[in-house]
């Protein structure tokens, strides 16, 4: 029996199907923790001066990590309270944030939080490629997709996203290993998101080409 976090009870489908997070709020829930992370790292010293108790956490990157973890939990809680479900991608990402964030604070080593994007993107890329290897296009489960594509469309889109996730993992490794912490934080917030938006928009022709009509979807 599947846990309700991942799948709604069929008997409640008609009642809960309409429970959706408004697009702007969904964007805020996704970007909010990242913005908190960026602000806390950039203004960490100011926050510590104003609230001395925060100094016990450590340098700005550690304060940013702690607030990032808290903001992630709050975002997931808001999403759950509104929909009674948690999309698989934010859920897995949130779990990794908490695990690697805790290691960062416990060991006082920011390497762990810097590796978090690498781990998450490699995980999703590997899952998608593994699914394709076994003849399964798992992208719809990862993104909780609302659109419907034919089999060829799902295969192509899944492969593209798998390679994109791997690309993001490689880029993250290059940036955090070769640049300052401040540069890495800025790129994580202001670089990855625009790149992802552009990539997503570039997939629209493929999605439109392989989209199923209501009649085709019913027949399939």
From Swiss-Prot:
Predominant localisation class: membrane
Disulfide topology: none
Subcellular location: Cell inner membrane
Membrane topology term: Multi-pass membrane protein
InterPro entries given in the database record: YciB
Record-annotated membrane-spanning stretches: 20-40, 57-77, 86-106, 123-143, 156-176, 187-207
Pfam family, one: IspA
This protein's UniProt keywords: Cell inner membrane, Cell membrane, Membrane, Transmembrane, Transmembrane helix
GO terms for cellular component: plasma membrane
Taxonomy, superkingdom: Bacteria
Family recorded in the similarity comment: Belongs to the YciB family.
HAMAP family from the UniProt entry: YciB (MF_00189)
General function of this protein: Plays a role in cell envelope biogenesis, maintenance of cell envelope integrity and membrane homeostasis.
Entry protein name: Inner membrane-spanning protein YciB
Species: Brucella melitensis biotype 2 (strain ATCC 23457)
Lineage summary: Bacteria, Pseudomonadati, Pseudomonadota, Alphaproteobacteria, Hyphomicrobiales
